[in-house]
Amino acid sequence: MRAIVLDRPGSFRVAEVPDPAPGEGQIVVRVDACGICGTDIHIMDGEFPPTPYPITPGHEFAGTVVAVAGDVRMNLPVGAKVAIDPSLYCGYCRRCRSGRDNLCENWAAIGDTVSGAFAEYVAVPAVNAHLLPGDIDGQLGAMVEPLACAVHGLRRLGPLFGDSVVLTGAGTMGLLLLQLLVHSGAGPVTVVDRVPDRLEVASKLGAARVAASLDELKDERFEIAVDATGVPAVVDGVAALLDRGGRLLVFGVTPAEATMSLSPFRIYNDEITVTGSMAILRTFAPAVELIGSGAIDPRPLLSAPLPLDQFGEALHRVRTGQGIKWHISPS
């Protein structure tokens, strides 16, 4: 089969590699679509420490079951359409045993630490596969993984009925978070982004107001602030807009060495709550349901998928901010 092989940071090729066979407890999936996300860019640039090289990246994917190991007892017949949770937890560390699987001390992930889905086929644990409703195509199925991350983020925030929200970043994750906020009953949601086309999409998806800069909102205060940019200065800026008793969700991934200027006195005196959100925690099945029911619609975010041979072009479009969400269709 053909696959993207990243030999070292900055150097990838489309290569012929052996077809995978299902190991114990595994299925083989023909990849229908695999999304490119910020983590893939970090892996390409050598900025994701857990990643070994060479590796085939790709962790946001959906496809068709083509082979099933004999010991698999789940209802995953050949021909079934599935989305795959890429998370690989050990199940025995202190955090896994306390229900915090996403903080596993031995964390691994398909496409991040073991070869993933920028390939025609991939072998995965059967327990990571989620059946898709028949009307969900490959691209929509590949959006389940990022939506599952967003669902976990909002669960971390807690109840938000009627609360005013400012959300920074109208990329893929920001626009999924926006839809979830609206669907969950948040009060008016204001979205901030520098790209006019993305703000237009945000308005169509339910934003009550859009702004091109945090400066436009400097005299306002919000009960909830959500950052989906991962830019430290933006995190500081949006935190400054919190009202007393406000809650901040740091969702975007900042550089590890970045710090915040949020005053400890303000956290104390204004009872500010700062919350992080790491990947997925038992939110994959709810994400399947949200897309399958039509409650969340990722289609306004999607560009036409590109073939494996155009992986480099897809990366260029992601890096230069063209479109919102790009997928590779290897098969």
Task: Please report, for each region that a protein language model flagged, where it lies by residue.
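N-terminal glycine-rich cofactor-binding segment
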Residues: 3-21, 38-67, 83-84, 101-115
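Glycine-rich phosphate-binding loop and adjacent beta-alpha segment
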Residues: 232-293, 330-331
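C-terminal hydrophobic helical "lid"/dimerization subdomain
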Residues: 281-331
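A short acidic, Gly/Pro-enriched loop at the edge of an enzyme's catalytic core
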Residues: 217-225
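Glycine-rich beta-strand-centered segment in the early N-terminal region that forms part
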Residues: 18-34, 48-94, 133-135
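Mid-domain Rossmann-like dinucleotide-binding core that forms the NAD(H)/NADP(H) cofactor-binding site
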Residues: 136-215
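NAD(P)H dinucleotide-binding glycine-rich loop of Rossmann-like/cofactor-binding domains
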Residues: 88-168
